[in-house]
Amino acid sequence: MIWVAVVITMLLFILVAKPTGIYLEKAFQGSKKLDKVFGPFEKLIFKITGVKEYNQTWKQYALSLVLLNGFMIVVVYFIFRLQGVLPLNPAHIEGMEPTLAFNTAISFMADTNLQHYSGENGLSYLSQLIGITFLMFAAPATTLALVMAFIRGLAGKELGNFFVDFTRALTRVFLPIAFMAALVFVALGVPQTLDGAVTAQTIDGAKQSILRGPVASFVSIKELGNNGGGFFGANSTHPFENPGQMSNILQMMLMMLLPTALPFTYGRMVGNKKQGRILFVSLFMVFLLGFITITTSELNGNPALNGMGIEHVQGSTEGKEVRFGTVFSSLYATVTTAAETGAVNTMHDTLTPIGGLVPLVNMMLNTVYGGVGAGFVNIIMYAIIAVFISGLMVGRTPEFLGKKIEGKEMKLIAVTILFHPLLILGFSALALSTSLGTDAISHSGFHGLTQVVYEYTSSAANNGSGFEGLADNTPFWNITTGLVMFLGRYFSLITMLAVAASLKEKTVVPETVGTFRTDNSLFGGIFIGTIVIVGALTFFPMLVLGPIAEFLTLK
């Protein structure tokens, strides 16, 4: 029965992807019906804020994005620092320590949601609502806006206006869908209140303080926007965030909704729907391989315990919630790292070595399917690399969407693809070379190395999940992961927007018999191979020293 539920869940991922992709294309490209519904409200916003609806250059678009995001980081930083004297603080929680406030503000603006604090004890209701939830809408709206400009550039059209796209992302996508999802979560038992903690009497007569809050509205945008941060420290393992299997499936659907839809949006906007389908199917195959790998490993249990003759019918159950079980915990771990959300319904630090390797590889690749917007930019980056390599092998000038891929584009892509591993491996080396980093490790040996690399991989990929055995709420970890999150977020977005702007200016080369097609199964295979060879092999030495070595040791 459990496998039937898994198949149905995956079918739901597939079935909602195309309709959502079509809706996104209409929402941003202009639809009379949508303009009639949302247009008056958006024009009012533009009038109040002084936004002029004109086409920007890629530099203007990127500058607008960075300045708006930077302003939001500063505002939210001071909310965290001053929450102790601000209203809506029934638990009288004090202001955040400076480096933790720095880390948290960047974390949520970068759509990472790395949490070096416990949600219910670290933030007031005001900080949760005005700080955290506000950024949970603004962060994915930023990248959804940018990916639309990116696709327009690839299609040879004007990039558009960042503030217009940002507003449309909020009014036409995130606010309506999150609102409806929040109502469903309330119906499923997720609390939504501004009241403080309630005191309950336990069976043995003791008193217990049960924390609550505006959780349903928080969880809906947490998953839809690929944010992932928890209202509670236990994240989606907490019964108030994720009461049962229905809420669990809904959360996974929300996580996958926009990332899986964007290939279809892309196909429609560039006038090649088949190419969008090829990208979707290719990535789903990689996703499926990851799920099969982690599930097989978790169901086989811990090799060390198996050798003792301990029964493991349910697989490795350490760190997992009984109400979800091993299979759905494995699926959730695959989804949350494939879609770069970072929400967890099981503790990733307790996964088996190969089970923990899958989430780690998903984040290292950062492209299966990746987070809202940012992930799709990486998908196209790998697609262009695949075309470039194929062109070199047959001695032809590489072409993508009928436009020649030349030195300028490849230099930008080369720098972009190297920057991600540089952040991860460089900062991991720094942490391992100083006691400021190694003192946080709770496990010696191979697993300790994986803890460190996982933290920086999660930060660079804007995922936010962690091997929570790492004692990371220290100035060193707060500052270094904050820098990695910021650089990992904005560097690739800007460089790839420059690539799209460069391609926009090029004339379309007529298609000939020798043109390498990017909308067939051959390209899909080369695309997958490029992801594996260029992406995964970059990190292979580290994976050998971490989870693979740990697995062989346990064996």
UniProtKB/Swiss-Prot annotation:
GO terms for molecular function: P-type potassium transmembrane transporter activity; potassium ion binding. The chain crosses the membrane at residues 2-22, 60-80, 130-150, 173-193, 246-266, 278-298, 374-394, 412-432, 483-503, 525-545. It is found in: Cell membrane. One of its GO terms (cellular component) is plasma membrane. It comes from the Bacteria. It is a multi-pass membrane protein. Keywords: Cell membrane, Ion transport, Membrane, Potassium, Potassium transport, Transmembrane, Transmembrane helix, Transport. Its main location: membrane. It holds the Pfam family KdpA. Part of the high-affinity ATP-driven potassium transport (or Kdp) system, which catalyzes the hydrolysis of ATP coupled with the electrogenic transport of potassium into the cytoplasm. This subunit binds the extracellular potassium ions and delivers the ions to the membrane domain of KdpB through an intramembrane tunnel. NCBIfam families: kdpA. The system is composed of three essential subunits: KdpA, KdpB and KdpC. Belongs to the KdpA family. PANTHER family: POTASSIUM-TRANSPORTING ATPASE A CHAIN, POTASSIUM-TRANSPORTING ATPASE POTASSIUM-BINDING SUBUNIT. This is Potassium-transporting ATPase potassium-binding subunit.
